[in-house]
């Protein structure tokens, strides 16, 4: 038993390698990227918050419904937006103003991109862009069906 205490003292007594200082810092990251919604148990995750080397991007959020029933979640928008779901590869709403009412089926996850309303869409290989900014890196949907 003393052997374990000696090992513990070896690792945690010096401030230059005190791992205890760093063991909980990941909780701060989770708090920074997570936001409550108006439905208990459904969280909105900011997919761009910790991407420090990101290319230009539109607001992107992941939302998952863990409930056994369909749920309606209200989402606030910063500007008029077309809502693109990169999981389904489709726009699920067009020309939304300040709030969008999202209906999620049970166990459904969406990754939503708030694209400026009426943005010009282009395909560049598998990339789908809106006004030159990538909104889907692996789009299989033909441009004329969006």
Regions found by a protein language model. Name each.
Residues 1-90, 96, 105-112, 116-145:
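Catalytic domains of carbohydrate-active enzymes that cleave complex glycans
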Residues 101-103:
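Residue-level "contact hotspot" at macromolecular interaction interfaces
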